[in-house]
Amino acid sequence: MTATLILLLLAQVSWAGPFQQRGLFDFMLEDEASGIGPDERAPELPDLDMLGPVCPFRCQCHLRVVQCSDLGLDKVPKDLPPDTTLLDLQNNKITEIKDGDFKNLKNLHALILVNNKISKISPGAFTPLVKLERLYLSKNHLKELPEKMPKSLQELRAHENEITKVRKSVFSGMNQMIVIELGTNPLKSSGIENGAFQGMKKLSYIRIADTNITTIPQGLPPSLTELHLDGNKITKIDASSLKGLNNLAKLGLSFNDISAVDNGSLANAPHLRELHLDNNKLIRVPGGLADHKYIQVVYLHNNNISVVGANDFCPPGYNTKKASYSGVSLFSNPVQYWEIQPSTFRCVYMRSAIQLGNYK
């Protein structure tokens, strides 16, 4: 009985037609003469839109970060994933940013365009970037800052360009801005419109170093805590230069041509803690240091200071309400250390914090 059943099963298998496994594109390999019957439909290709965003050719995409740096690109790639939050295009050969280059990138938070050849940015190029917080344009060929930057912007870095003008209109309504970097540009004082930075209520950090400005920009916002103007051609600090900077904590004026600091200048920055005036042309210690309550670090090395008075740094009858100095540099000045009275540094925290000598 069992043998009979097995024979019947084998007979059914031998009578059955050959099994054909059809793949997705097998219809392309069939005999063209057979065609498609009236009741048959060709297999449908998958909808590419259902597969999600596609990474631009040669770029790398991971966790909403699109990296297209160092690829020799001469324009912004097309069809960038709309969920991109960081786009890195640095070290390419892009010459122009056009309207539509960043369309649909409403979630972009950071845009890196450093070290390209950008000389032109269309007025509406950044309009779609409603959430952009960081814009890096350094090492390009821009002559002016772009118009209509996103109001959400918090950090702008555009050093090492060819910028000669900073218009007030560029920063109009930029109430979220915190950091601005404009160093190493052929910028002159006349090129900075008066009050260009004034309306930005959260602005905390400005760096305009290694340019051709001869004065401290006017109309700086009171929110500023750090101002770096090193390596310029500033000749003097007027009584009004720091007016209104009540929150300024760090002031960098190294490597300028400053020969005088007007009395009362430092009083306009009552919370100043660190002052860099090294590598200038000062002939005396700036007035007002002894009366300054919070200042702790003063760099005055490489100047022409020949005399240091007993009360230049500390008030008479030093009281503990003034913060102690943690650093005072006077080396590479004509004044000899033995000519300075020991009591001059009575409000310095440690003697090792005082740097003298080495003048040639």
Curated annotation (Swiss-Prot):
Disulfide bonding pattern of the chain: 55-61, 59-68, 314-347
Annotated TM spans = none
* PTM text: The attached glycosaminoglycan chain can be either chondroitin sulfate or dermatan sulfate depending upon the tissue of origin.
Q: Which residues are glycosylated?
A: 34, 212, 263, 304
Q: Name one Pfam family in it.
A: LRR_8
What GO molecular-function term can you cite, just one? extracellular matrix binding
Q: Where are the LRR repeats?
A: 74-94, 95-118, 119-142, 143-163, 164-187, 188-213, 214-234, 235-258, 259-282, 283-305, 306-335, 336-360
Top-level lineage group: Eukaryota
Q: Which InterPro entries match?
A: Leu-rich_rpt, Leu-rich_rpt_typical-subtyp, LRR_dom_sf, LRRNT, SLRP, SLRP_I_decor/aspor/byglycan
Q: Where in the cell is it found?
A: Secreted, Extracellular space, Extracellular matrix; Secreted
Report the leader peptide range: 1-16
The record's similarity note reads: Belongs to the small leucine-rich proteoglycan (SLRP) family. SLRP class I subfamily.
The protein's name is Decorin
Species in which this protein is naturally found:
Oryctolagus cuniculus
